[in-house]
């Protein structure tokens, strides 16, 4: 789809949500995704990655989660055609709503709060769940720090949009 946009000279880039949203170890998928436009037009934005904070996790479980923002930022820094938004989490109450039903279910199992998911002849269903990001939670604090790391480590400020996870 990125190649199609370039071939057709469309005025906007592909807006992409990476796979493995919010899963420890997902930074590898993000790095592979960042390599997609590497041979395309370096003179204009060809790829916009969303909520990259949620796609910059190392480790294999919530117990050993760590930041891999440095690796993500290093990749973005070599690709002038890529723009990301950081998807910064804000401490306190929020609501997530997404068509990524499996991710909403994972959040439900983490927070044990209310959860609603609906699917009508779709590949995935939209879900809604209230979330409380706590300063006292190590995982939530790491999430918060990853967003800041991305903003500080990406050298070109026009390549990292300052966004929050919710509202977005």
What are these regions (language model features)?
Residues 1-159:
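Histidine/acidic residue-rich metal-binding segments in metalloenzymes
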Residues 157, 161-168:
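Terminal or standalone catalytic/regulatory effector modules within metabolic enzymes
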